[in-house]
């Protein structure tokens, strides 16, 4: 059955989600928007939607090649992808390989310190509460996720981290940290949402130059879209 777009059901900071003629399938449309200060400042960038869509598709396929289930089905267009409709778990899972960002505000740790083993952090997805950090006990007690699924997700996260660190390292890049989300389809765990330079930090391995959304967040004197494109090309996701 050919998938056809129907109604817009959700619009976030970086994507719009549409229903389709198949109740088990959605369409994600990436946006040109980039935001900082919790969405208070938004700017549009040409080609950002295309880069993020292709980058996400490339990374998700790399991950799925290691027998990790993702929601990705197929590309629909330059800025749209067809995905499985998951029952999303309301938790953001963050993996940290180097000390940067909010970690520096919460702990007395030197910036750019290598973290071994990597730190896993959980954040409850709630804009009104500003996505508070939680632990496994909150997750279980508040019925956000089962203990069994937590164990599986932790194992998957470490596996994904090793996969991605290797991909970036071979491209002379450092994977500093990243955020992922998971959901359920017929009771099975799937990696959902996206992996892009909007929700990860990547530095050049030799110069430590920032090549992700921090360029925009910190108003650095760099072209953020050219950096996104360079990272994509360096890891093998060729962007025109």
Swiss-Prot record:
SUPFAM superfamilies: SAICAR synthase-like. InterPro entries: SAICAR_synt/ADE2_N (IPR028923), SAICAR_synt_PurC (IPR033934), SAICAR_synthetase (IPR050089), SAICAR_synthetase_CS (IPR018236). It is an enzyme of class 6 (ligase). Pathway: Purine metabolism; IMP biosynthesis via de novo pathway; 5-amino-1-(5-phospho-D-ribosyl)imidazole-4-carboxamide from 5-amino-1-(5-phospho-D-ribosyl)imidazole-4-carboxylate: step 1/2. The keyword Cytoplasm does not apply. It catalyses: 5-amino-1-(5-phospho-D-ribosyl)imidazole-4-carboxylate + L-aspartate + ATP = (2S)-2-[5-amino-1-(5-phospho-beta-D-ribosyl)imidazole-4-carboxamido]succinate + ADP + phosphate + 2 H(+). Keywords: ATP-binding, Ligase, Nucleotide-binding, Purine biosynthesis. One of its GO terms (molecular function) is phosphoribosylaminoimidazolesuccinocarboxamide synthase activity. One of its GO terms (biological process) is 'de novo' IMP biosynthetic process. It comes from the Bacteria. Pfam families: SAICAR_synt. GO terms for cellular component: cytosol. Its EC number is 6.3.2.6. The keyword Ligase applies. PANTHER family: MULTIFUNCTIONAL PROTEIN ADE2, SI:DKEY-6E2.2. Belongs to the SAICAR synthetase family. This is Phosphoribosylaminoimidazole-succinocarboxamide synthase.
